[in-house]
A protein has these predicted regions:
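Bacterial N-terminal signal peptides
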Residues: 9-19
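Sec/Tat signal peptide C-region and signal peptidase I cleavage site
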Residues: 20-26
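Extracytosolic ligand-binding ectodomains
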Residues: 2-4, 10, 26-418
Length: 418
């Protein structure tokens, strides 16, 4: 080991003396363990999630934090489970960043707390952290910072849209997945808070070959609207089965329905038969961040996997990873204690407003305080690592997702705090 280190040092010195850039040693990398899906109920998201992560890291690596390029290790959780995948990334791959603790975090929380306490790593930014209880995160002992509001907020937004659409009652259903359950419970609570009639709320199995019995059960209740929280495949199947049964419903789905698997499963003809098929998801801000982001994403080699860069997951990946990288530069080291404080510093306060990674990294290196506002809008965090968001209503039109409305974010936050 000593001989290898001396040889490496000599090679670097020789390269410098000859005027060449010194090669980056593997130990200088920042390794990002990406908890993603390649198999299972959400397996269709895999190429998209991986492509988005690679696209964002390519932007950051044009001028990486602390001069240390960031490299992703994409780890499927669909088959082995989130807990086992997380342990593999931390113990075997030695990642410094664990990206996307999510639905099953509580099953390995003790392991992560012990690891962070012992090593001061990994950092835990999470696009899917909205499925984690809102009292968890935002501390050096548990450095979870979310890229989106809590999942419950999307459930609240979906129900508010039903009311704004002029409907008088609703049936609310969800698959037995943690995030879907949280959204359903929030929608039911919202209905109670605003005095909206819920004709029924019930759970369904994920991954069924068809949902004809569910369609029949809903039909007997004769609702004016149906709200469903599920995977793209399950949602698409229900939409198609309902159309096959001759139903024409006002359907509001969850953000997962942004994946093309939903559109392909539901089919264009079935969607057209319904009164409406829309979904509630986070939308982008109208600020200087958006167009440069779109231009970069569309020009990247991963655009074929990403599809529409305005997808809420894509913009959340972008802002979260950019903010995380800026915080690493601000901290001056890779450690949960300094990074946690830096996450608050670079996303809030009275610092110089910046709208891109380039602006932020340059300002930090000039010794300035910054306040990063990204594609999703303000990135200011609560003391448990929760970020706010903008809420849009979307529908599939000729194979492409289009925003057709919005939901009052202040009203969502008001109901969420009750």
């Amino acid at each position: 080991m000593k001989r290898s280190s001396v040889a490496s040092a000599g090679a670097i010195a020789l390269a410098a003396s000859l005027g060449f850039a010194a090669p980056v040693a593997a130990e200088d990398e920042i390794v990002v363990g990406h908890l993603t899906y390649h198999t299972g109920e959400f397996g269709a998201f895999g190429p998209f999630f991986d492509g988005v992560a690679e696209m964002v890291l390519s932007k950051i690596n044009e001028d990486p934090p602390l001069g240390r390029p960031m490299r992703a290790v994409h780890q499927d959780i669909g088959t082995v489970g989130e807990a086992r995948a997380a342990r593999k990334l931390v113990d075997s791959d030695g990642v410094q960043i664990l990206l996307n603790p999510a639905h099953s975090y509580l099953s390995y929380r003790e392991f992560m707390l012990e690891t962070v306490a012992d090593k001061g790593l990994p950092l835990m930014p999470s696009v899917h952290g909205g499925a984690i209880e809102g009292t968890i995160g935002g501390t050096s002992a548990e450095p979870i910072f979310r890229g989106s509001p809590l999942d419950t907020a999307n459930g609240t937004a979906a129900l508010l849209h039903v009311q704004e659409a002029g409907k008088k009652n609703v049936v609310i259903i969800a698959t037995e997945v943690a995030g879907s359950q949280l959204q359903k419970e929030a929608a039911v609570r919202t209905a109670e808070a605003i005095g909206f009639e819920v004709l029924g709320d019930f759970d369904i199995q994920a991954g069924e070959s068809n949902y004809r019995s569910v369609v029949a059960r809903i039909s007997r209740l004769n609702p004016e609207a149906v709200v469903m929280f599920s995977s793209p495949q399950a949602g698409g199947s229900l939409v198609k089965n309902a159309a096959e049964a001759g139903e024409s419903w006002y359907i509001v789905g969850s953000g997962e329905w942004q994946e093309t698997e939903f559109y392909d499963t539901a089919t264009e003809s079935a969607i057209a038969q319904h009164e409406a098929v829309v979904l509630a998801a986070n939308s982008h801000a109208d600020n200087p961040s958006f167009q440069p982001y779109m231009d970069f994403a569309n020009a990247s080699k991963w655009i074929g996997d990403i599809g529409d860069p305005a997808n809420s997951y894509a913009i959340q990946y972008y802002d979260l990873l950019v903010a995380s990288a800026l915080a690493i530069e601000k901290a001056g080291e890779l450690n949960t204690a300094s990074w946690t404080q830096a996450m608050y510093d670079v996303t809030g306060g009275e610092g110089e407003k910046v709208y891109s990674y380039e602006e932020g990294i340059a300002a930090i290196r000039d010794g300035k305080d910054i306040n990063y506002d990204g594609v999703t809008g303000t990135m200011e965090y609560t003391d448990t690592g929760i970020v706010s968001g903008l809420f849009g209503i979307f529908e599939w039109q000729d194979g492409a997702l289009a925003q057709v409305g919005s939901v009052d974010g202040d009203k969502v936050l008001e109901l969420e705090s009750m």
